[in-house]
Structures are given as C-alpha cells and as structure tokens.
C-alpha cells in the first residue's frame, strides 16, 4: 500500500525555466531576472549582518520589512506580510481559503504555478481563457469560488488590465481576488488603492524582478489586516532568514537605485520591441521586464532551438495557446543587441 496522498502521487509538478549550472557561458533571458545587480546598499547591509548574528533566529514577524514596505506604499504594518518569495504567499492564500474540493480560478495563459499549488491542497482548478482583446471569456456574473488569481501585468504576455476592470472584477468575485503584481514595478499602474477600499482584494509582490533579489527569495502581500492575520497563522514561523530580512529593508529604502534600474529596463524593453517589429515579429506591448513576441512563421520552437544552439536562453511554452511565440526577458542593451543579431541571422 502506498501511503502517499493520491493527488500528490498523480500530479506532475511545476517545471521552472532552465537554469544552467554554467550560467556564465549563456546569455540568460528565460526567467525574467533583473540584468543589473542589487543596490550596493543591499550588499553592504548583508555583509554587515554576516557574523555572530547568524547564530540567532531571525525576527519571526519580519517587522522591519513590514514597516519599511508600509512606509513606502502607505499602509500600516499590519496590512503587510513578508514572504520567502511571493510564491509562499500564493501557496498560503490557497491553504487559508481553499479547502479540499473547493475551487480556485485563474486566467489562462498566466502563471501556471497557481494550478500546482491548488493540486497540492486538493482544491479544484478552473481557468478562464482570453479573447483577442484580452477580456475573459465566459466569466460569470458572480464567481463563487474561493480565490481568483489575476496576474497583472499578465505573464507571459505582458499586457496590463486597467484598474477599472480589476475593480469591477473584484465586485463579481465572492471570494478573494488576488492580484499578482510580480511585474507591476515596470508598469504605470497598480492595485494598491483597491486594497485600501475593497476587503476582498490582495496584492502580492516579489523582489525577484525589479529589486534584483531572485537569489534571496523575497516577496510580500498587502491586504486587509484580517487576511494578513490569517496568513501569519499558517506561514513558517521563521520564513525569512536574517540576511533576507536585511536585504529587504535595504532594497526598499534605496528607491533612487531602484528607479534607475527600472527606467533602464523599460527603455531597453521598448527599444527591443521596436527592433523586433523591424524584423517582422508580432510583438505584444509589454508592461513587464520581458517581451512576448511571435516570429513571422509563427514557429516559436524553431527559433527557440536555434537560439539555444547559440547559447541564448529564452522561454518557449509548448501550450498551444503560446507555442507560436517566445517570452524574452529584458537584459542589458548589449545582451539584447546580441539577441537581435542572432534572430536576424536565424530568420
């Protein structure tokens, strides 16, 4: 007899982007990492924390991070929870709100990890497809499931929903509307104001993209204090180590460096998109740190393989909804020039 839970034994699990062990030998544009290093103040703060303090447990509530995020975004600290990557918050939201057999939903295509997290919990999953104008197909007047996840800006496509649409959607969701803003720092709008006004809206953020801290696993959520209190009950009690908490505070405090990096990425993204169009690629206007684009022959796999041979990594999705194109992370100007030259050669 196999004592393993049936749903765990049968699930496939999430497959992340390829991470080469010899990454220095690749142009790595497949996992939406920031091409620039963390703030020098972050490195300085981490190095200052390394030493005798590491023998002590970290602050279980990550209070300094909650306070710094609250100051930056205009919330009291009890509206904020820090996490070991925003994935931890997404996982705990499902654990807190969706029991076995209960339903969560999300837009397809978007972040498929929502489905994996629901499978672990034994929850049901429902997806809503997009029409050509990015509207949700067949969305009911009232959605009665426990959680609805909306990735905004959308990943992997990069478009952004207007806040008016998100507010209307929140009014049609009986449960919680989770706005996954992993890429919001590269966009012009966010949903933080909706959190203040609507108790069923949660915003999640990550430090992996705009703050260059993918290797530290840092994220946060902002929500009504009752929701935050529930998430605090079920998170790992020491979910952020001392170095991560130190990096979090230093990163949030150095907004000048943050804005410089974000501005450079936006500028490179828009330039790269324009250059792809010169090559007759179909490019979706992006509000993230990546571009989803389709080659003239609509054969994303062919171009992916040709780039891989040149040790340029981009993201290909075999899903029929996405297989015509590629998601290309925005790197440095030099990396994107190299990629454009390769694409012109590949044809």
UniProtKB/Swiss-Prot annotation:
Q: Which is a GO BP term held by this UniProt record?
A: L-histidine biosynthetic process
What InterPro entries does the entry give? Aminotrans_II_pyridoxalP_BS, Aminotransferase_I/II_large, HisP_aminotrans, HistidinolP_aminotransfase, PyrdxlP-dep_Trfase, PyrdxlP-dep_Trfase_major, PyrdxlP-dep_Trfase_small
Pfam families reported for this sequence: Aminotran_1_2
Q: Which reaction does it catalyse?
A: L-histidinol phosphate + 2-oxoglutarate = 3-(imidazol-4-yl)-2-oxopropyl phosphate + L-glutamate
**Keywords assigned by UniProt?**
Amino-acid biosynthesis, Aminotransferase, Histidine biosynthesis, Pyridoxal phosphate, Transferase
Quote the EC number: 2.6.1.9
Entry annotated with the keyword DNA-binding: no
Top-level taxonomic group: Bacteria
Q: Which organism is it from?
A: Syntrophotalea carbinolica (strain DSM 2380 / NBRC 103641 / GraBd1) (Pelobacter carbinolicus)
Cofactor(s) demanded: pyridoxal 5'-phosphate
Q: What is this protein called?
A: Histidinol-phosphate aminotransferase
- Similarity section: Belongs to the class-II pyridoxal-phosphate-dependent aminotransferase family. Histidinol-phosphate aminotransferase subfamily.
This protein's pathway:
Amino-acid biosynthesis; L-histidine biosynthesis; L-histidine from 5-phospho-alpha-D-ribose 1-diphosphate: step 7/9
Q: Which residues carry this modification: N6-(pyridoxal phosphate)lysine?
A: 209
Q: GO terms for molecular function, please?
A: histidinol-phosphate transaminase activity; pyridoxal phosphate binding
Q: How does it assemble?
A: Homodimer.
